Regions:
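A short, hydrophobic, proline-anchored segment that marks a local hinge/packing element in signaling
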Residues: 110-120, 128
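N-terminal leader/propeptide and maturation segments of large enzyme subunits in energy/redox metabolism
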Residues: 10-15, 157-232
Length: 245
C-alpha cells in the first residue's frame, strides 16, 4: 500500500478525473504553444521539446505526450533547481532558464524554462518545458562537438538564471545569453515561446485552484502520486523471481 502522506484525499472520483485531465491538458497545451510560437524548425517542425507540471517539491504530476528522455528528468530538474534557488527567492511571474547537465541531465542544447506557480501567495506547483535550441554556442555551429575534451567546448552553460519576472523580460540577462549563441533572432523567438508556454500553464493552474480550492487540488496531487505508487508496486509484484537490472 502507498505510504500515508498525511494529506486528505478528494472525496469524489469525478473531481479527481476532472483535475487529472485538466493537468494533462495543460501539459499538452504547453507543448503546442512552443511549437506554434517558436522560430526554429527544430521546434516548429521536428517537435524536439517536452512539457510537464510538478508539485511544489518537484514531484511530477502531469506530462505531455512528448519525448521520454526529456520527461524523465523534469522532476529531477525542479528538485536540483530548488537546491540552488531557495523557495524564498521565488516570486510570482518568475521564469528561470537553465541547461546544466547536473541540474536536469541531457545535453547543453536542451534548455529548460521553469516557472513557479503561486496561489494566494503560496507556492503550489511548477510549470517546466524543455526545448532543444538549434545552437547553444561552443566550438561548432549546432553545438555538437564530438571531439570535445571538456564541457566548456560544447556551448554556453546556463546556471539557473531568471530571465522574466512580473515586471517583464530582463533584457540585460536575455541579451547576455543571446550574445553567446549563433542565430540570435531564432533563439530569441524560441526563448519567448518557452516563456509563453509557462505563462499559460501558470494561468491554467491558477484557474483550476480558483475553481476547486487549494485543498481539493492538492489532495488530487497526492492521490495521483498514491495511484502511481500502487501501479508500480503491482508491476513489481508481477515480475517473476530472478535477478533484475
Amino acid at each position: 500500500q502507498p505510504a500515508d502522506r498525511g494529506q486528505p484525499m478528494t472525496r469524489h472520483p469525478a473531481t479527481l478525473e476532472v483535475v487529472r485531465n485538466a493537468l494533462y491538458a495543460t501539459a499538452e497545451e504547453m507543448s503546442v504553444i512552443v511549437m506554434r510560437s517558436a522560430r526554429s524548425p527544430l521546434l516548429k517542425e521536428a517537435g524536439d521539446l517536452s512539457s510537464a507540471l510538478t508539485d511544489a517539491e518537484g514531484r511530477l504530476i502531469a506530462q505531455g505526450r512528448d519525448i521520454p528522455i526529456h520527461l524523465g528528468v523534469m522532476g529531477f530538474t525542479v528538485k536540483e533547481f530548488l537546491k540552488r534557488v531557495p523557495k524564498d527567492r521565488l516570486r510570482e511571474g518568475d521564469v528561470w532558464f537553465l541547461n546544466l547537465p547536473e541540474v536536469g541531465g541531457n545535453h547543453l542544447p536542451d534548455v529548460k524554462a521553469l516557472r513557479p506557480v503561486f496561489v494566494g501567495g503560496r507556492l503550489v506547483a511548477f510549470a517546466i518545458n524543455l526545448a532543444h535550441w538549434a545552437d547553444i554556442g561552443g566550438a561548432v555551429p549546432g553545438s555538437y562537438v564530438p571531439w570535445a575534451t571538456e564541457c566548456y567546448q560544447e556551448g554556453l552553460r546556463i546556471a539557473p538564471i531568471r530571465l522574466f519576472s512580473a515586471e517583464g523580460p530582463d533584457r540585460h540577462a536575455i541579451d547576455f545569453v543571446l550574445a553567446n549563441l549563433r542565430g540570435r533572432d531564432e533563439r530569441e523567438g524560441d526563448l519567448f515561446a518557452q516563456f509563453a508556454a509557462d505563462d499559460v500553464a501558470a494561468r491554467r493552474l491558477q484557474e483550476l485552484f480558483a475553481h476547486y480550492g487549494a485543498d481539493t487540488v492538492l489532495a488530487c496531487f497526492e492521490r495521483l502520486h498514491a495511484e502511481s505508487e500502487m501501479q508500480m508496486r503491482a508491476a513489481l509484484r508481477a515480475l517473476p523471481d530472478g535477478a533484475w537490472e
